[in-house]
Amino acid sequence: MSVSTALKLCIFFTGFAGIVAEYSLATLATYLLGNAVLQWSVVISIFLLSMGLGSHASRYIPDDKTPLAFVLAELFLSLLVPFSVPIAYHFANNFLHLQTVIYGLSFVIGSLIGLEIPLAVRINNMYEELKVNISSVLEKDYLGSVPAGLLYAYLFLPKLGLPLTAILAGFFNLISAFLLVKVLKPKKFLKFLAIFTFFLLATYAVGHKRITLYEEQKFYGEEIIHFEQTPYQKIVLTRFGKHYSLYLDGHLQFSTLDEKRYHETLVHVPASFLKRYEKALILGGGDGLALRELRKYPFGEIHLVDLDPKMIEFSKKNLVMRKINENSFYDTRLKVFSEDAFNFVKKTKEKYDFVIVDLIDPRTPSSARVYSLEFYMSLKNKLKEDGIFITQAGDTFYKREVFCSILKTIKKAGFYAYPLVVYIPTFGEWGMVIGSKEPLNFENFELKEKTEFLNRERALAFYTLGKSLECPNVEVNTLLKPVLIYYYYKIQN
């Protein structure tokens, strides 16, 4: 194999590895720091800046040292990219240190990636004329980037998970280093260094699960009994003593210590106002806990919409989850749809008596859609005239603007809106909003089913507390102006 051919293969592999490295660090930042839009923007921007600086720095490398510099850059990348995952998790419980570590890693890795193309062009300059040299090097870099981006989204992250994906990127960098070592025949120390790097990376690849589990358990502070990366999210179930907690992408969804406070309020307060029990819809609620409470009512049909079929499978088959949700997914009245909730509401021809919106907080543009004016207007058309819906509306203490914006948006859609605030020890003061086409009378409120935590007095107290909250001057959340994302991260930032 000629040096020029080997070099072009190297550039293809480095283009592939570079995109995987960028996406892996952006995903890692999202998992640990939150705010997907912000983290992807910041990490990719840091990469672009550092790649430019790396390209600039390449001019100071003497011509006779360019092959050595290229190989060393690939060897460093082959270790730095894979090890960035456990390094970041090690600092996961310190927000300021974590930001410095992730952004610092992005800068260093980006700088090394920035060296690649200028060095490759200079090495290849001996074998091809300038116009062919530059175009062929850039061509191979771009061609390597395209499959990397697609495979990352559709295969690597959902099937391999983040740690193994980063290891894969490292091996592509290592292959590039070995190719150049083979054709350039450098000094023995470089061959030894390449072999040593291979053994380090291979050892980490074999033991990465143990290392990752150790760092993950430090992050969650509890024993991890189930860990799964799906195409949509990372599912983690933990145990602490007799209690279990579920996390999605690092965010707590429930703890068995107090989840009934949330789910009983979410279901039984609005359900007690219903005049008919024919057809119900749950949007989200893939853990089956809202469904567990809803099954107590004599609905003829229950539809549940959750984007992630793996979440449904986990909740249906995992023995711990089955015990918590009381085998709710085996109810014969249930029909599950693995679809996006926003799109389902928009296209369905069904009319419902009761709708429960039990979805994640509006942390991203995608999740903010199901708290938008357009969504609530679509939902209004899917409710019967005496139908009722309820949505979770987030933390009312630290993120009151989020709660107030959701409340205002529901009113803007033409609903009668009734705020509830329930205290949940693991979450704090948590808001919910009931929406109805007809006015509801809380003075005559009576629970229709037996509950473990909820009673009439508590339900009325939750409504009284909800009404008493003073809302700041917030905007309505829309698709074109998703203000909820700004409100959600305002306190944290």
UniProtKB/Swiss-Prot annotation:
Superkingdom of origin organism: Bacteria
Chain intervals for the UniProt region annotation (Spermidine synthase): 187-448
Active site location: D358
One GO MF term: spermidine synthase activity
Residues that hold S-methyl-5'-thioadenosine according to the record: Q233, D306, D340, A341
Record function comment: Catalyzes the irreversible transfer of a propylamine group from the amino donor S-adenosylmethioninamine (decarboxy-AdoMet) to putrescine (1,4-diaminobutane) to yield spermidine.
Known partners and oligomeric status: Homodimer or homotetramer.
Main subcellular localisation: membrane
Pathway membership, UniProt: Amine and polyamine biosynthesis; spermidine biosynthesis; spermidine from putrescine: step 1/1
Protein family: Belongs to the spermidine/spermine synthase family.
Topology class, membrane: Multi-pass membrane protein
A GO-annotated cellular component: plasma membrane
Pfam families xref list: Spermine_synth
Keywords, ordered alphabetically: Cell membrane, Membrane, Polyamine biosynthesis, Spermidine biosynthesis, Transferase, Transmembrane, Transmembrane helix
Top enzyme class: transferase
Residue ranges of every copy of the PABS domain listed in the record: 202-437
Subcellular location: Cell membrane
Protein name as catalogued: Polyamine aminopropyltransferase 2
Example GO biological process: polyamine biosynthetic process
Parts of the chain that traverse the membrane: 9-29, 32-52, 68-88, 101-121, 137-157, 161-181, 188-208
